[in-house]
């Protein structure tokens, strides 16, 4: 009995030790982020991260515990082979999760969840486009080496039998003792006997989010995310549904008051519309907003010539979330993406569908893979009639990691505009891709690789608009220039508010005059605002608000996997969803947006559940 109990405890605490040691490795790998931390900070991270390590170790020790019980009844070699196979699989899975998390954190700024699985299986090529061949190769080699090291440790400590375990005389007693020990794993797995079960918030201990992120066990984070993907009506339950309904009713678009009038931004109600959705752009690239000079020179020019929304925010952090925000006025979700569920996107209203009913001809242009993240099904269900994507360009023109570079994309669009008879009015959605990792572009104006890629994308947009101005279509065209999500420059940004600020600019012959709109808004508000300007109904867009309506509440709302933000003129608030605590609270009315932000997210998941 004693040997089996020792082996059981050794298995459990070996898993714990391996998880604990991953934390300083993570911090050393990202030493640029942790340059000013002390040795004591390393130990604090390891200590506070223990709850998740203990929990996951409990899950992983359950099967070895059952095998030890079985070994009290038979010494069959099958048990040894199962044991060897189990630890081999676990070593490989642990290595894959740790190395993938190590590689992705630098791009995404949060620990591994189930998101990469969706991206990879929707389009493996595009999922890998952000990184170089050598980065992938080094990652694979690192996984294999780390898996081999883990298995060697498991073999030396747990698998190799110096003296095979004998079948005990009192096997019933041994089995009962091991069964009780295995059952006791429920305690660390669940996190104790309190009402709340184990979750990521258990390891949050610092106001410095770097420390909290380092304390997270990436394997637990991935498992938790994967097992909580679809129970939307159980997620983010902050308050009684009636209270959430009451608060949400204050945050939706309102009828125009009798004493108010909506400022008309356009000189026509049926302009041709071209959306240019700019990959990863941010206000930090524009001198207009106090950002980098001499980078987005055309966007700076458009900001002066057109209608600039100066307090505008990205709804989320990835294209699949951002596109749904722009086109359907649907907020990004922290734990999933509505694009994963075609049966739900089929039921969402969209700008293209509304414009199609108004007689618009609809087209979508993208140099990359339109099947990435289920984009094609979303676009088709939104009413898009013609989709131009990477497969529509010859191989010689698909020189970028994401497919056709931006200048090729705009050349194709201009060619189609000139050669094909345009049915007016039309809507064209144009999505750029070159200003994305790995930032490799056929353009060399700036020394900084990242800034140069944005300058390239900006030049492509500028060249296209300049050519378009020379066509008869210009006079009756509205351009909507907006990034697909939060910006990729600079990185990292410690203040989450700064990371979400993006430009929204309207230009074209269809606008009345240049204007700066300083109302707080986000991508979800484009739908209601545009349709209102066109005199079209937008009641179906539950979460979208008309920015120009004085009677409507004005706020920006955004999410990432670990927080939401609600921004108004008097309160800028960010709430950490992992730690269940306020992460940032600024303005003259601190805390004013907390309950509203919670209610908004709760109602978003209510809506997601019933779709």
Describe the function of each predicted region.
Residues 2-231:
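Transmembrane and membrane-interface helices of multi-pass
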Residues 18, 114, 124, 216-220, ...:
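Alpha-helix initiation and N-capping motif
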Residues 37, 122, 217, 232-234, ...:
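Short coil/turn linker and secondary-structure boundary residues
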Residues 78-82, 233-243, 338-343, 543-545:
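Short alpha-helical "patches" and their helix-cap loops
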Residues 136-138, 242-247, 379:
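Long, well-ordered, tryptophan-enriched scaffold segments
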Residues 204, 208, 215-220, 224-262, ...:
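The feature marks either
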Residues 249-611:
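Solvent-exposed soluble domains appended to multi-pass membrane proteins
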